[in-house]
Amino acid sequence: MATRRIISQEKTLLEKDDSIGSSPAADEKSNIAPAVPTSVIMKLLAFTLGMIVIPIGSYFATVDSVFNGNSTYAGALAAIMANVVLIGYIFVAMAEDQSDQQEGGGPGDGKKDR
């Protein structure tokens, strides 16, 4: 059986407590820092652009000039160049992760041990 709500005892929307998980109080500053550093976003955008431009550019630059119209070799070169960009991104990400670990100090500074 359903229970009856007593509307006179309930708080209205304006009377509810705003401190439970919502916005900070008026005198506090809110943290508007991005969750991911800007340098990481810029590296990701640069490698994304490189992943698009370098393989396609290498294909069209070499299909007629180097490989004399043989699109198989030019396509293989484009695939190799895409892998070069991907490996470059992996190296940059690993170097950044190692520098973050050296700056952080001990293993208990935010990241779990693996």
Curated annotation (Swiss-Prot):
In this record, what's one Pfam family? VMA21
- Alphabetized PANTHER family for the sequence: VACUOLAR ATPASE ASSEMBLY INTEGRAL MEMBRANE PROTEIN VMA21
Q: Which GO terms describe its biological process?
A: vacuolar proton-transporting V-type ATPase complex assembly
Membrane topology (Cytoplasmic): 1-39, 95-114
Q: What is this protein called?
A: Vacuolar ATPase assembly integral membrane protein VMA21
Q: How does it sit in the membrane?
A: Multi-pass membrane protein
Compartments it resides in: Endoplasmic reticulum membrane; Endoplasmic reticulum-Golgi intermediate compartment membrane; Cytoplasmic vesicle, COPII-coated vesicle membrane
Q: Which family does it belong to?
A: Belongs to the VMA21 family.
| Family annotation (HAMAP family) | VMA21
Give the motif span (Prevents secretion from ER): 111-114
Q: Where does the UniProt annotation place the signal sequence?
A: none
